[in-house]
Amino acid sequence: MASLLWGGDAGAAESERLNSHFSNLVHPRKNLRGIRSTTVPNIDGSLNTEDDDDDEDDVVDLAANSLLNKLIRQSLIESSHRVEVLQKDPSSPLYSVKTFEELRLKEELLKGIYAMGFNRPSKIQEMALPMMLAHPPQNLIAQSQSGTGKTAAFVLAMLSRVNALELFPQCLCLAPTYELALQTGRVVERMGKFCVDVEVMYAIRGNRIPRGTEVTKQIIIGTPGTVLDWCFKRKLIDLTKIRVFVLDEADVMIDTQGFSDQSIRIQRALPSECQMLLFSATFEDSVWQFAERIIPDPNVIKLRKEELTLNNIRQYYVLCENRKGKYQALCNIYGGITIGQAIIFCQTRRNAKWLTVEMMQDGHQVSLLSGELTVEQRASIIQRFRDGKEKVLITTNVCARGIDVKQVTIVVNFDLPVNQSEEPDYETYLHRIGRTGRFGKKGLAFNMIEVDKLPLLMKIQDHFNSNIKQLDPEDMDEIEKIEY
């Protein structure tokens, strides 16, 4: 296949440019004026006021988080979830595979898989691939987290059913954003590098194709609105010829205005023999209702919920008078115990920016991660943190889930997570302090609490039936006795 995406030297140069750009932000006392260009606090420590949203909670963008996890994922994750399979025909045999050779793939596809670095199927792929590659084709609804090989699985299904000699769209994949569509296309490019004459085309914003143009690419990847336009208005895609229909990131789709209705309209124009595959990271009721409307007679793969635990995390709280008191307590803790790497969570961008400047001016190597940064910038910052170039990551809720750094030993809640009703956000608390104590290790969590917020912390303690011990930040002997 011809090169379909940016990458190679250009991609490396862009990564280096981003790293260089953010070195202004993460090195103490080095070119602090560089902060201003990224809307971090001004040189004198005062805060920029151009962005009125800084006082608002930093809202998590599901699509951006999904893309971020794809960008920073370095290898496949072996999920600890138990896989549950519900077959449309319970009496039919259930197959799983341990090697790609068992799937009897075309030689060029096997070469592409191994060239990507896959040695054997992941846990999800073991169960999903026999269903996705079956003859006759079977429909599938699958729950799969980022990093488990889900994209590679449905790309393999598309490439397996494409006829390179037929020059018209045969496979259609819907993604919720332009960037996620490009990420999927990159997987098609890499896996299909040995598939001669198989090509992909992007039905995404900005890719204007004149009405009446004959589309000869076999695989179309796009966002629902543009695909709908290409199919019904511009008549570029004949949906009656589509053999494989993939709907990726369904939970993000239904979170985006109009996408679910557009996707259903596209699906209804597909032939009955078209194979339909839907993937979602979560299976809440709204996702299930959408999946059942759009995928007829499916096999279902679900992940039994992993119980996040706080048992291996020691939790403390410190009573403080104000923001400066919190910072002084943080400094005392920082000076009294050995820290590998730490993540500090703030509820608002304003507090995150203020804390970044305070720590930088005191000589700490810190980086700042918030929702105003692009996904690529966030990925660069996380990679630097993962590489140990900074020891402290200050962030809002954009980092509460899905980002695993083995060296993180301490999590600090500079602000308690609360919902719009100013009640404790229990799930966010769980995922925040879950950034430590991972991979079977013990961890520490510190909560900086103003007196009027203490009832919220007590609700959190009762909710999780856990012990959150009060810590005196002035008692250095007590701090130094803290063990992981």
Swiss-Prot record:
Keywords tagged on the record: ATP-binding, Cytoplasm, Developmental protein, Differentiation, Helicase, Hydrolase, mRNA transport, Nucleotide-binding, Nucleus, Phosphoprotein, RNA-binding, Spermatogenesis, Translation regulation, Transport
InterPro entries: DEAD/DEAH_box_helicase_dom, Helicase_ATP-bd, Helicase_C-like, P-loop_NTPase, RNA_helicase_DEAD_Q_motif
Motif (Nuclear localization signal): 101-115
Post-translational modification, as annotated: Phosphorylated on threonine residues. The phosphorylated form is found in the cytoplasm but not in the nucleus.
Enzyme class, UniProt record, top EC level: hydrolase
Motif (DEAD box): 248-251
Residue numbers bearing the Phosphothreonine modification: T49
Occurrences of domain Helicase ATP-binding (ranges): 131-301
Signal peptide (residue range): none
Motif Q motif: where in chain: 98-126
Main location: cytoplasm
Reaction catalyzed: ATP + H2O = ADP + phosphate + H(+)
Gene3D superfamilies linked to this entry: 6.10.250.2170, P-loop containing nucleotide triphosphate hydrolases
Biological role stated in the UniProt entry: ATP-dependent RNA helicase. Required for mRNA export and translation regulation during spermatid development.
Protein name: ATP-dependent RNA helicase DDX25
